[in-house]
Amino acid sequence: MKTTYVNATIVTMNEQNEVIENGYIIVENDQIIDVKSGEFANDFEVDEVIDMKGKWVLPGLVNTHTHVVMSLLRGIGDDMLLQPWLETRIWPLESQFTPELAVASTELGLLEMVKSGTTSFSDMFNPIGVDQDAIMETVSRSGMRAAVSRTLFSFGTKDDEKKAIEEAEKYVKRYYKESGMLTTMVAPHSPYTCSTELLEECARIAVENQTMVHIHLSETEREVRDIEAQYGKRPVEYAASCGLFKRPTVIAHGVVLNENERAFLAEHDVRVAHNPNSNLKLGSGIANVKAMLEAGMKVGIATDSVASNNNLDMFEEMRIATLLQKGIHQDATALPVETALTLATKGAAEVIGMKQTGSLEVGKCADFITIDPSNKPHLQPADEVLSHLVYAASGKDISDVIINGKRVVWNGECKTLDEERIIFEASRYKRGLQR
């Protein structure tokens, strides 16, 4: 099946960050086979031609760190620091989860993400009360591209920890794939919730199965102090000593990193999922993304969970990310719009090991989203496309979402998930949680 999308303004995110006016994209099954400007002559003998009527077309957004199973916890635990938020709000509520509630919560997060333009994401879920196979089936049904990882903790007894490692290894062996729509990573929660033995086992599983690692690291000053007091090393050095960085690793946050650590992480291909809104809301601080990029680190933007954000709007994250860097450095040139867009598209895709997506180029997967600026005053005049995408647009502006060549959202309507049912069930299950 060949489909051509014509009469579009195309934000390619190629090496030149080229914006093509009055262009077209040809998709064959799940791949982009041509991207050009001008009138379409049907040289490829396509099956369908769709007039985009001047819509902006850009790569699907890539969210590098989420917790979609937590989506029912939106608004619970506002105005709290990370540790009390986890210990008195999030973990007690997660302990009440059932398989049915976890699916309803996941569906809500997936619906919010895809309708706001996210096409790919990397997720960590707490396995307590969760049917992991049902979660993977739910993500698959959504049509999204994802790395969904089972989180490991050292809570309970040593036997509990051993069982957690065994279950996580089975999960990795079942779901890890080098390519395709769904995969997984090895995901120890953090250095403050995992023993040294567990982190070493996670490193072993990652090496033996050739997977990536996903971990919360250097998120707060308290974490750095506590790990240094307990192990005599800062979190980065401690994680390295456990062998975690033998495989490409995504660290969520990286708020508290010094110059030497940034250089070390760049050398060891450790990437950062930058969560600006979540870090601000939890009072964790502001990650120095400008310095990370200057050190050669790979960085991708993320939302974290709705419990700490409180939405999954990647446009908002792009805007906050660039404004924060300008503010903390007192440098208006820090993190310009092209860089912010890169960190939410092709750069983010590289961070989570999905190089097949993130830009609109021949050979890439057909993952793209559209915005119709014609009826939106906040996107007018419509000629400054890149600026408007970062500084003015929001997820609510999305018209269409195409993932792997399939129309997942069309004219604002999700084709893969039952929006009315999901919203109804979210409210019903939320009422059952004991706060």
From Swiss-Prot:
Binds 1 zinc ion per subunit. Zn(2+) binds at H65, H67, H216, D304. Its EC number is 3.5.4.28, 3.5.4.31. Its cofactor is Zn(2+). Gene3D superfamilies: Metal-dependent hydrolases, Urease, subunit C, domain 1. Substrate binds at E94, R150, H189, E219, D304. GO terms for molecular function: 5'-methylthioadenosine deaminase activity; metal ion binding; S-adenosylhomocysteine deaminase activity. It catalyses: S-adenosyl-L-homocysteine + H2O + H(+) = S-inosyl-L-homocysteine + NH4(+); S-methyl-5'-thioadenosine + H2O + H(+) = S-methyl-5'-thioinosine + NH4(+). Keywords: Hydrolase, Metal-binding, Zinc. Pfam families: Amidohydro_1. SUPFAM superfamilies: Composite domain of metallo-dependent hydrolases, Metallo-dependent hydrolases. Catalyzes the deamination of 5-methylthioadenosine and S-adenosyl-L-homocysteine into 5-methylthioinosine and S-inosyl-L-homocysteine, respectively. Is also able to deaminate adenosine. Belongs to the metallo-dependent hydrolases superfamily. MTA/SAH deaminase family. This is 5-methylthioadenosine/S-adenosylhomocysteine deaminase. It comes from Bacillus cereus (strain G9842).
